């Protein structure tokens, strides 16, 4: 599925969602808020480099990297993508995310780890395009696109994983 915009937004389903959810939702549900993190996310937020020691998270990150088409070379050099930041967001009642973007990164992503269709959408602000949450769905988008998450209005939490992708010389 593609969202109509001037830029490609990749939407897909992670085939190993149940395994990932089973392993990390219990960790994130009891995650303490990180008070010193400067973020547009007005919800519980993990560290910026969270989950690097968890096998199912490593597998997920690798999968996302493989979903992004990249130029093979630029200016004579060959590049590959790497995940620069990776964090979890735990939205509880009345939590939200302010309008923002992820510049200067190349691409960013959101993964709906725990959500229902009626939870707050991911909204691409300038287009008014709403992406309804569904467990297992990922959304990969150019980092410069403005986006936000409206207030979460339910008792049960909504949990997402997010990250930024950038180039490195191979």
What are these regions (language model features)?
Residues 76-151, 156-170:
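Catalytic core of non-heme Fe(II) oxygenases with the double-stranded beta-helix
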Residues 1-80:
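Non-heme Fe(II)/2-oxoglutarate
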């Amino acid at each position: 599925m593609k969202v109509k915009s001037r830029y490609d937004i990749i939407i897909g389903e992670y085939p190993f969602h149940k395994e990932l959810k089973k392993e990390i939702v219990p960790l994130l549900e009891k995650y303490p808020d990180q008070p010193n993190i400067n973020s547009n996310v007005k919800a519980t937020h993990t560290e910026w480099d969270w989950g690097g020691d968890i096998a199912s998270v490593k597998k997920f990150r690798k999968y996302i990297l493989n979903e992004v088409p990249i130029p093979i070379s630029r200016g004579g050099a060959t590049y590959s993508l790497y995940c620069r930041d990776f964090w979890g967001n735990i939205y509880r009642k009345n939590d939200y995310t302010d309008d923002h973007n992820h510049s200067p990164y190349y691409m960013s992503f959101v993964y709906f780890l725990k959500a229902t269709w009626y939870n707050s959408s991911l909204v691409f602000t300038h287009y008014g395009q709403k992406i309804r949450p569904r467990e297992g769905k990922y959304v990969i988008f150019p980092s410069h696109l403005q986006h936000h998450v409206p207030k979460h209005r339910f008792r049960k939490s909504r949990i997402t994983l997010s990250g930024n992708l950038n180039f490195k010389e191979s």
